[in-house]
């Protein structure tokens, strides 16, 4: 991408970006095109990060390991649901991912955890997500029992209207009372160390990012 195009794109994306300044947006655009590769300049080809490339970034850079959660994070970034992350989706997604307010992060995490998109986190959804985070003990007759117990404990803590599922209102109230519950069903945001390392590297020289 030539300098003029890059400058124009930077100006456009900075206008709609809450948490990055112009220099940071420029670095993230440069990184995006480094990750996408040569396809960027081909006419008629949709430019974007596909699911595999994006999941690799989540895994290698931000230490995420849960396939289900990584898939949901991809969907959270891919707002137009076209199967790849465009440069504007990349900037807006990272703005929240790295520097979002508590309100923004609550909305994002809830959408990640609401696996079927019906506006609630059901017992079944909790079970699926928590199952991946618990180690099975070989001595247990029914390893799912421990997970079912954990679901019940979580509901008791977070289900304020006692309807057997979590609405956003339930979730928000619980998280405001105890911030640690933000990622109650699995890590879907970077930990502070990964975030600092990513920002230090990318906002210094995005061209060296792949050497990390």
Swiss-Prot record:
Principal subcellular localisation of the protein: cytoplasm
- What does the entry list under GO cellular component? 9+2 motile cilium; axoneme; cilium; sperm flagellum
Q: Which PROSITE patterns match?
A: EF_HAND_1, EF_HAND_2
The residues listed in the UniProt record as binding Ca(2+) 1, with positions renumbered to this chain, are 78, 80, 82, 84, 89
Annotated Gene3D superfamilies = EF-hand
Residues given in the record as Ca(2+) 3 binding sites = 159, 161, 163, 165, 170
Note the InterPro entries from the entry.
Answer: EF-hand-dom_pair (IPR011992), EF_Hand_1_Ca_BS (IPR018247), EF_hand_dom (IPR002048), Recoverin (IPR028846)
Q: What happens when the gene is disrupted?
A: Mice display typical phenotypes of primary ciliary dyskinesia, including hydrocephalus, situs inversus, and abnormal motility of trachea cilia and sperm flagella. Strikingly, both males and females are viable and fertile. The 9 + 2 axonemal structures of epithelial multicilia and sperm flagella are normal, but the formation of 9 + 0 nodal cilia is significantly disrupted.
This protein's record includes keyword Hydrolase? no
The cross-references to CDD domains, in alphabetical order and at most eight, read: EFh
Q: Which residues form the EF-hand domain?
A: 65-100, 101-136, 146-181
- Residues bound to Ca(2+) 2 are 114, 116, 118, 125
| Localization per Swiss-Prot or TrEMBL | Cytoplasm, Cytoskeleton, Cilium axoneme; Cell projection, Cilium; Cell projection, Cilium, Flagellum
SMART domains of this UniProt entry?
EFh
**Gene Ontology process terms (BP):** cell chemotaxis; cilium movement; outer dynein arm assembly; regulation of cilium movement; regulation of flagellated sperm motility
Q: Which UniProt keywords apply?
A: Calcium, Cell projection, Cilium, Cytoplasm, Cytoskeleton, Flagellum, Metal-binding, Repeat
Q: Which GO terms describe its molecular function?
A: beta-tubulin binding; calcium ion binding; calcium-dependent outer dynein arm binding; cytoskeletal motor regulator activity; dynein heavy chain binding
How is the quaternary structure described? Component of the outer dynein arm-docking complex along with ODAD1, ODAD2, ODAD3 and ODAD4.
Purpose of the protein: Component of the outer dynein arm-docking complex (ODA-DC) that mediates outer dynein arms (ODA) binding onto the doublet microtubule. Seems to regulate the assembly of both ODAs and their axonemal docking complex onto ciliary microtubules. Regulates ciliary and flagellar motility and is required for cilia-driven determination of body laterality.
Write down what this protein is called.
Calaxin
The organism named in the record is Mus musculus (Mouse)
């Amino acid at each position: 991408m030539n300098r003029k195009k890059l400058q124009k794109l930077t100006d456009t994306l900075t206008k709609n970006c809450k948490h990055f300044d112009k220099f940071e947006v420029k670095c993230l655009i440069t990184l995006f095109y480094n990750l996408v590769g040569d396809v960027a300049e081909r006419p008629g080809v949709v430019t974007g990060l596909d699911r595999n490339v994006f999941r690799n970034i989540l895994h290698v850079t931000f230490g995420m390991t849960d396939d289900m959660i990584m898939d949901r994070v991809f969907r959270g970034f891919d707002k137009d649901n076209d199967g790849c992350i465009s440069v504007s989706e990349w900037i807006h997604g990272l703005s929240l991912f790295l520097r979002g307010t508590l309100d923004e992060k609550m909305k994002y995490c809830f959408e990640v955890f609401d696996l079927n998109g019906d506006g609630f986190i059901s017992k079944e959804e909790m079970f699926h997500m928590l199952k991946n985070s618990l180690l099975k003990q070989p001595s247990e007759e029914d390893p799912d029992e421990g997970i079912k117990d954990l679901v019940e404990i979580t509901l008791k803590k977070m289900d304020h209207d006692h309807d057997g599922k979590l609405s956003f209102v339930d979730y928000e109230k619980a998280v405001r009372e105890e911030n640690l519950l933000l990622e109650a069903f699995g890590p879907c945001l970077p930990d502070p160390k990964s975030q600092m390392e990513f920002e230090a590297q990318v906002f210094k020289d995005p061209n060296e990012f792949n050497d990390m």
